[in-house]
Curated annotation (Swiss-Prot):
EC number: 3.4.24.-
Superkingdom, taxonomy of origin: Bacteria
Gene name as annotated: htpX
Lineage: Bacteria, Bacillati, Bacillota, Bacilli, Lactobacillales
Residues holding Zn(2+): 143, 147, 227
GO molecular function, one term: zinc ion binding
GO BP term, example: proteolysis
Name of the protein described by the UniProt record: Protease HtpX homolog
Length: 298
């Protein structure tokens, strides 16, 4: 089953990459139409910029994601207990020892990232170290190292990168429209017909709203089922479902994180922003109670 899941994750990576390229192309086309009346100019700029960003980040994606989340790398002497738990879980999972980071945030949480098991890293918050006992930490780190073993980190890293790119493009567009849109409209009103106005409105809506939402939904599609599998794999490693159950309950009852990066939310073991209501539709994690019920039946 493990090798089948790894193969599925690699196929999903290719499919999600295609989906993100489509979204990027549409966002770029809208951007080009708004700024120069040339969709192709925007497409070329968006795709070329994204490719350069991906190539730069791909050299060491863990470093950039850790930086976005204000995580600080540690060595064994800095926190021997945490180091040895990670070391033990890595040995049981049969993956290389990942780099270890601590996030200076009082809310308990953790995540893993990297492009493959040989270039992986795990991060835990200061809050999780203060709040949880060894059994709970083993459950959490077993979950994160299961993501490493199953190549989930590759999918998640790609999702973070591409959502970040699309959000960056949308941010540039919104600032440009805010500062310069009024002047352009005054100059162009005489020469603009009704169809051009409609197309510009559609382009604005897609670049500023639909593009980022579509990217977030694509990222969400990467995450939900993988959390259930990582929970089950953690129990396989620790032989103790109660440790992870207790950890999930403590995380669910905690305050939202202050140091987490929003584009990285899907990486964490539990949503660091604790979305509720309508925003739960866009959550990258299954409901905690559903996860706990599955663990209780193992």
């Amino acid at each position: 089953m493990l090798y089948q899941q790894i193969a599925r994750n690699k196929r999903k990576t290719a499919l999600i990459m295609v989906l993100f390229v489509v979204i990027l192309t549409l966002v770029g086309a809208g951007l080009g139409y708004l700024f120069s009346n040339s969709p192709w100019t925007g497409i070329i700029i968006a795709l070329a910029g994204s490719l350069i960003y991906l190539l730069i980040m791909w050299q060491n994606p863990a470093n950039m994601i850790m930086s976005l989340n204000h995580a600080q790398e540690i060595q064994e002497a800095d926190n021997p207990e945490l180091w040895h738990i990670v070391e033990d879980m890595a040995m049981v999972a049969r993956v290389p020892m990942p780099r270890v980071f601590i996030i200076p945030d009082p809310s308990p949480n953790a995540f893993a990232t990297g492009r493959d098991p040989e270039h992986s890293a795990v991060a835990v918050t200061q809050g999780i170290l203060e709040l949880m006992n060894r059994e709970e930490l083993e459950g959490v780190l077993g979950h994160e190292l299961s993501h490493v073993r199953n190549y989930d980190i590759l999918l998640s890293t790609i999702g973070v990168v591409l959502v970040g790119v699309i959000s960056f493009i949308s941010g540039i567009a919104s600032r440009y429209i805010w500062f310069f849109g009024g002047n352009r409209r005054d100059d162009e009103d005489r020469d603009t017909n009704a169809f051009e106005i409609i197309f510009k409105v559609i382009a604005i809506v897609f670049v500023l709203i639909l593009g980022p939402i579509s990217a977030s939904l694509a990222q969400m599609a990467l995450s939900r089922n993988r959390e259930y599998l990582a929970d089950a794999s953690s129990v396989e490693l620790t032989r103790n479902p109660q440790g992870l159950i207790s950890a999930l309950r403590k995380i669910e009852g905690s305050q939202p994180m202050r140091q987490a990066d929003r584009s990285s939310a899907g990486l964490y073991i539990e949503n660091p922003f604790h979305n509720h209501g309508l925003s739960h539709l866009f959550d990258t994690h299954p409901p905690t109670e559903d996860r706990i019920k599955r663990l209780e039946h193992m």
